[in-house]
């Protein structure tokens, strides 16, 4: 009888451990929100994730255009400051889905709003139109990154590719950004000291 009781306790502890691990995973997933809606021939994207970073740390991370960390699909990148608040990022990108490989050049202008976020506008690239914004909202325990964008795809791109990208890649990229923010929580940039 005592043996059964001990085994039950071990089983209960094991199950509780799995529940805690599952809950932690759900909490991380719950801090990332992505909503994609088709509208006006394009896609409206709303997304957000919570980070443990201060607003200053979050802004430095958001505007780190010259990061050495590899980004999926980006083959080369050139950064040019156009004004005190505007940066142009030119990239050569190669993206792969199933048997399809897409190569394109992208030029995006970013207008920075120190400590608050930035707006972005595609000048040249994969889409007919791509514009959006990032905003940083200080919260208790960190900073909320919020993203809003409108993407109007080229009509020559097969719709199933666009839908796959929108439904899978956007969520994956938000998860990577949130993970990167979590890894940087102990790094205090010089301008935040």
Regions found by a protein language model. Give the residues of each.
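Bacterial N-terminal signal peptides that target proteins for export
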Residues: 4-16
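N-terminal signal peptide c-region/cleavage motif recognized by signal peptidases
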Residues: 24-26
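Hydrophobic ligand-binding cavity/cleft-lining segments
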Residues: 29-84
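Short, low-complexity Ser/Thr-rich regulatory SLiMs
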Residues: 38, 81, 110-112, 134-140
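Short, surface-exposed coil-to-beta transition loops
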Residues: 44-46, 101-106, 128-133
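Glycine-rich portal/gate segments that line the openings of hydrophobic small-molecule binding cavities
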Residues: 50, 69, 73, 78-124, ...
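Extracytoplasmic/secreted envelope proteins and their assembly/folding machinery
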Residues: 55, 59-63, 76, 133, ...
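Beta-strand/loop substructures that line and gate deep hydrophobic ligand-binding cavities in soluble
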Residues: 122-172
């Amino acid at each position: 009888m005592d043996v059964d009781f001990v085994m039950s306790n071990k089983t209960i502890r094991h199950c509780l451990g799995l529940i805690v691990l599952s809950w932690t995973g759900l909490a991380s997933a719950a801090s990332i929100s992505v909503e994609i809606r088709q509208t006006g021939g394009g896609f409206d994207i709303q997304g957000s994730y919570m980070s443990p970073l201060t607003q200053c740390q979050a802004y430095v991370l958001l505007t780190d255009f010259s990061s050495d960390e590899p980004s999926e699909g980006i083959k080369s990148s050139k950064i040019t400051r156009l004004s005190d608040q505007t940066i142009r990022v030119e990239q050569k990108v190669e993206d792969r889905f199933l048997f399809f490989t897409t190569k394109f050049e992208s030029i995006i202008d970013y207008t920075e709003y120190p400590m608050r976020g930035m707006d972005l506008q595609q000048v040249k690239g994969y889409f007919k139109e791509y514009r959006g914004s990032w905003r940083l909202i200080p919260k208790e325990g960190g900073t909320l990154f919020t993203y809003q964008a409108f993407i109007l795809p080229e009509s020559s791109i097969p719709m199933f590719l666009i839908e796959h990208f929108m439904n899978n890649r956007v969520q994956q990229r938000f998860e990577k950004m949130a993970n990167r923010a979590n890894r940087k929580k102990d790094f205090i940039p010089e301008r935040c000291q």
